[in-house]
């Protein structure tokens, strides 16, 4: 069902088309090879909040049927800050991974193909009486107890921990999971899907991997960053070489894959992109920033989500890494992307977006669209195909993208959301309408928190924050009222 983004640390240092953007200089970014840990790890334990639709146990709020829909952020009672001590998490399409201070990996959500990395087959499931007055198709019983409740993956599943190495990043796609260790090793579990169903996990040898497994390809490389998509994942090594693994039917692996050779993609391999210092993935498209400060993208581009051209057409592909244009002197902080939209956050807190408009994915008001907005044959605005700065919004420090919604954290620690609203993943309450522009998430649970990390799945969202002192909370509230 869709994209996920790793949580990013907000505290880390035929149709009408208009004129083309002027040529600009390349952007810059923090050196991921030096500072990548800071992007994904909080310096202190977090309260964890979850919201949206959790019919596949995505919310991690326990097995009761009432937890299938949560319309505003809710504190996760199974991850108390002073006990669980969660410092990071990664959100997949229908599951979430979390990391605690001791490098234990927690998981919850859908485990149909082993994405949780632990056995949930003996869970108790209690179904409601289907003749009961309150029964319905949507709430016909409780959830799988072991999938809907956060739990640790057995520590012995990760041999590097016994050698003193720590987990420095987690990553989750729709159907698989990864853990990156401080020694550059990668452990993975789950599987990859393609248009026809399950593609497989590793070569033609493993179809589904239900427990963490050391990826042998990286025994001779030191991996420093992971970038998960829907059914693919990118890896960056310390020399700046990018590897790709998984489904490549939309060119997301950076190379053309012949149908008869598609199992060849089930082994991580480089595809010629080198001298890179930062990587990011959407569901079926990708980004990389080179060491000479060129931001490039590739993959599926039918709504301009790659941000490289005004040409928008159904099934369009960017077949090899192509450079994006951004305003002069932009320093990139992070990139998040969903199925058909992309978000680029600058170190100054400015947010640029490109991609689909139908569900307000880009967060740009329809009465202020740029002149290069793509319109269909009926004159309806459908996409913004080039990175465009969002105006009249706060300065942000962190951003995450789900399939068709996004969450961003302002520099004062308050979360904002926009996009597809029917699944309540925007966290704005009982309203099911799509949200046009970044809108403050207001609720009692998070009103006194400094939100640090955010992540988005297919139909849900997760955030992590630290409670402010009474004085700081009051000060922020006064500033917001001004």
Curated annotation (Swiss-Prot):
The keyword Signal does not apply. Phosphorylated; possibly by KSP1. Its main location: nucleus. Pfam families: WD40_RLD (PF25390). GO terms for biological process: cell division; nucleus organization; poly(A)+ mRNA export from nucleus; protein import into nucleus; regulation of mitotic cell cycle; regulation of mitotic spindle assembly; response to pheromone; ribosomal subunit export from nucleus. Residues 131-145 have a biased composition (Acidic residues). Changing residue 20 to A/Q: Impairs activity. The keyword Transport applies. Changing residue 20 to T: Impairs correct nuclear localization. GO terms for cellular component: chromatin; cytoplasm; nucleus. GO terms for molecular function: guanyl-nucleotide exchange factor activity. Keywords: Cell cycle, Cell division, Guanine-nucleotide releasing factor, Mitosis, Nucleus, Pheromone response, Phosphoprotein, Repeat, Transport. SUPFAM superfamilies: RCC1/BLIP-II. Induction: By pheromone. The modification Phosphoserine is found at residues 135-136. InterPro entries: Ran_GTPase-activating, RCC1/BLIP-II, Reg_chr_condens. RCC1 repeats lie at residues 45-101, 103-152, 183-238, 239-291, 292-347, 349-411, 412-466. Guanine nucleotide exchange factor that promotes the exchange of GSP1/GSP2-bound GDP by GTP and controls RNA metabolism and transport. Involved in yeast pheromone response pathway and in mRNA metabolism. Involved in nuclear pore complex (NPC) assembly and required for mRNA and ribosome nuclear export. Binds chromatin and is involved NPC-mediated transcriptional control. Component of a multicomponent complex composed of six to seven proteins, which has a collective molecular mass greater than 150 kDa. Interacts with GSP1 and YRB2. Present with 12100 molecules/cell in log phase SD medium. This is Guanine nucleotide exchange factor SRM1. It comes from Saccharomyces cerevisiae (strain ATCC 204508 / S288c).
